From Swiss-Prot:
Cofactor binding mode and count: Binds 1 Fe(2+) ion per subunit.
Domain named Fe2OG dioxygenase: residues: 214-313
Pfam families the record matches: 2OG-FeII_Oxy (PF03171), DIOX_N (PF14226)
Entry keywords, A to Z: Iron, Metal-binding, Oxidoreductase
Protein name: 1-aminocyclopropane-1-carboxylate oxidase homolog 9
GO molecular function: 1-aminocyclopropane-1-carboxylate oxidase activity; dioxygenase activity; metal ion binding
PROSITE patterns: FE2OG_OXY (PS51471)
Length: 365
């Protein structure tokens, strides 16, 4: 089969799959025993590409930080130091004692699962391929770019405080808890921005005053069990187009971050939330804080549930301009990026990350 004919076959298979609007769960419900070709990672890829240092006992672990430890001035300084080290060296860390009740964490995971396990005809009412739709269900929003497809279904929900969704726009299966959880996440986002601001050696309100906390996109994933997990990925490697991402994952696991050229498991910690530095944060901090590639491995167990909340100023019409923070610049540390708007950055983001290229690098001076 020629390369051209193989691509035509792939596109036809992709079109047939998307037209069902049943997602990956729909495939699994048919009791398939093999992963369709449109999900296969290239044969040249490997899921076990850790370096020897990882194999011979380096024991890399993503930092776990207790946000309840900053009750005194001295303790706050220690907490900020831990945040700084994690943001600079890992771009990832987990937080405990973050203020969101465990019951709310449980409820949002249950709500996400309820929606994805709804009658397919109910879910189809929310099916959309436009990432800008305020509430949308799909299997891979990046179907025009992503090859191969990822082994997951998702729904997105924009819960911007300035332009919130009307309750009736959210499916009943997850309506109340989406609204409740987004409020808690925005409060936590405010605290994290204070800590990150202080970690930069700046006023604690600088990130908030830059309007970095105006928007919230919830991306709620459902990873069905996979019969051949070594042939595909839950999510391909990528970075996030956010300032920070606040992620809730269940206990199944599969999330990995690239650190020192090794894929490191972000092992689930009961009650914890995963915080990752996004591309916008790396840009405005002039590479002081790092947005790191991460991915999700497919798993025979499942379904796996995760809720990723992208804290940003939103992708809808927004003229706010962002560039490296002036207080961080000097003759020895000049600006490494040009000023941009969030919508400008978002254009082409999906095409870049799933092509294995850094979108952020396109804006370097």
């Amino acid at each position: 089969m020629t390369e051209k004919s193989a691509e035509l076959v792939r596109l036809n298979e992709l079109k047939a799959f998307v037209s069902t609007k049943a997602g990956v769960k729909g495939l699994v419900d048919t009791k398939i025993t093999e992963v369709p070709r449109i999900f296969h990672i290239p044969s040249s890829s490997t899921l076990s590409n850790n370096k020897p240092s990882d194999i011979f006992g380096l024991n890399l672990t993503v930092p776990i930080i207790d946000l309840g430890d900053g009750n005194t001035s001295a303790a706050r300084n220690v907490l900020v130091s831990k945040i700084k080290e994690a943001a600079e060296n890992w771009g990832f860390f987990q937080v405990i004692n973050h203020g969101i009740p465990l019951t709310v964490l449980k409820d949002i995971k249950q709500g996400v699962r309820r929606f994805h396990e709804e009658d397919p005809e109910v879910k189809k009412q929310y099916f959309a391929t436009d990432f800008n739709t305020r509430f949308a269900y799909n299997t891979n929003f990046d179907i025009h770019y992503s090859s191969p497809m990822n082994w997951k279904d998702s729904f997105t929900c924009y819960t911007c405080p300035q332009d919130p969704l009307k309750p009736e726009e959210i499916p009943l299966a997850c309506r109340d808890v989406v609204i409740e959880y987004s409020k808690h996440v925005m409060e936590l986002g405010g605290l994290l921005f204070q800590l990150l601001s202080e970690a930069l050696g700046l006023d604690s309100e600088i990130l908030k005053n830059m309007d970095c906390l105006k928007g919230l996109l919830m991306l709620c994933h459902y990873y069905p069990p996979c019969p051949q997990p070594d042939l595909t990925l839950g999510i391909s490697k990528h970075t996030d187009n956010s300032f920070i991402t606040i992620l809730l994952q269940d206990q199944i696991g599969g999330l990995q971050v690239l650190h020192q050229d090794s894929w490191v498991d972000v092992t689930p910690v009961p009650g914890a939330l995963v915080i990752s530095i996004g591309d916008f944060m790396q840009l405005i901090t002039n590479d002081k804080f790092l947005s790191m590639e991460h991915r999700v491995r497919a798993n025979r167990d499942g379904p796996r549930i995760s809720v990723a909340c992208f804290v940003s100023s939103g992708v809808f019409p927004n003229s706010t301009v962002y560039g490296p923070i002036k207080e961080l610049l000097s003759d020895e540390n000049p600006a490494k990026y040009r000023d941009i708007t969030i919508p400008e950055y978002t254009v082409g983001y999906l095409a870049s990350i799933f092509d294995g290229k850094s979108h952020l690098s396109k804006f370097r001076i």
